[in-house]
Amino acid sequence: GCDALLSGDHGGLLSANGC
């Protein structure tokens, strides 16, 4: 998601909010 660099969510699955 948008926070991939911070959360380690490189696929954007966990932090897709607002993306």
From Swiss-Prot:
Positions of disulphide bridges: none
- Which body tissues produce this protein? Expressed by the venom gland.
UniProt keywords (A-Z) are: Cytolysis, Secreted
**Which biological process annotations from GO are given for this protein?**
killing of cells of another organism
Broad class of where this protein is predominantly found? secreted
Cytoplasm found in the keyword field: no
| One GO term describing the cellular component | extracellular region
Q: List locations, semicolon-separated.
A: Secreted
Function, in words: Presents weak hemolytic activity at physiological concentrations (micromolar range), and weak lactate dehydrogenase (LDH) release from mast cells. Does not induce mast cell degranulation, and antimicrobial effects. In vivo, injection into mice induces very weak or no change in nociceptive sensibility, and very reduced or no edema formation. It also reduces mice locomotion, suggesting an increase in anxiety, but causes no alteration in rearing (standing on hind limbs).
State the protein's name. Cryptide Pep-2
Q: What is the scientific name of the source organism?
A: Tityus obscurus
